């Protein structure tokens, strides 16, 4: 994805960028001041269409500046227009190989079709959809998988029931309930 360094920070400059089909953005690098950028709106939206729902926090993008240098980044914040749902602003965080990052990793429940509790008339309720973790960029999982196939009525699975790699440190209580089977 191409990134253009922008100098104008006034409201009129930002509105002009949006009229030209650009998205104003800020790139944060550890220990430095944020860099103001502009991203092509059509290009970003085409990438965004291919990202699975809920997986944006763990999707790594490559920004290419005017000089041709590449930077691997994560989207830290995205702002949408209320009425049109157009992307209005982006915040990126640059990934540095030897620096740990905090990230929200999506949790996907598998085995819901064959779940014992669902077959008995219950409903699967996923209480937590993301787990906050701290890890190196190379160790970041794209999602966590939680098998709920053997859950019966009124049974639950907790964060500690997931397979979390040793290189990943959870930043939330591992006794939190992720999914539960409830009566209709």
Swiss-Prot record:
Keyword match rRNA-binding: yes
Has the keyword rRNA-binding been applied to this entry? yes
Keyword entries, A-Z = Ribonucleoprotein, Ribosomal protein, RNA-binding, rRNA-binding
| Biological processes, Gene Ontology terms | translation
What GO MF annotations does this protein's record show?
5S rRNA binding; structural constituent of ribosome
What SUPFAM superfamilies does its record include? Answer: Ribosomal protein L25-like
Which Gene Ontology cellular-component terms appear in the entry?
cytosolic large ribosomal subunit
Q: Gene3D superfamilies attached here?
A: Ribosomal protein L25, beta domain (2.170.120.20), Ribosomal Protein L25, Chain P (2.40.240.10)
Q: Which family does the record assign?
A: Belongs to the bacterial ribosomal protein bL25 family. CTC subfamily.
Q: What does this protein do?
A: This is one of the proteins that binds to the 5S RNA in the ribosome where it forms part of the central protuberance.
Subunit architecture: Part of the 50S ribosomal subunit; part of the 5S rRNA/L5/L18/L25 subcomplex. Contacts the 5S rRNA. Binds to the 5S rRNA independently of L5 and L18.
Q: What is this protein called?
A: Large ribosomal subunit protein bL25
Q: What is the lineage of its organism?
A: Bacteria, Pseudomonadati, Chlamydiota, Chlamydiia, Parachlamydiales
């Amino acid at each position: 994805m191409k990134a253009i360094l922008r100098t104008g920070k006034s409201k009129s400059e930002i509105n002009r960028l949006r009229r030209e089909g650009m998205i104003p953005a800020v790139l944060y690098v550890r220990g430095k001041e944020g860099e103001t950028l502009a991203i092509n709106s059509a290009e970003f939206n085409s990438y965004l269409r291919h990202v699975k729902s809920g997986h944006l926090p763990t999707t790594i993008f490559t920004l290419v500046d005017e000089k041709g240098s590449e930077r691997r980044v994560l989207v830290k914040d995205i702002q949408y227009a209320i009425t049109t749902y157009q992307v209005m602003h982006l915040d990126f965080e640059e990934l540095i190989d030897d620096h740990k990052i905090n990230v929200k990793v999506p949790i996907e429940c598998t085995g819901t079709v064959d779940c014992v509790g669902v077959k008995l008339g219950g409903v699967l309720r996923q209480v937590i959809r993301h787990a906050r973790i701290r890890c190196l960029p190379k160790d970041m999982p794209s999602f966590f998988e939680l098998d709920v196939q053997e859950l019966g009525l009124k049974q639950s699975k907790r964060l500690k029931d997931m397979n979390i790699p040793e290189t990943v440190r959870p930043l939330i209580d591992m006794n939190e309930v992720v999914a539960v089977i409830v009566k209709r």
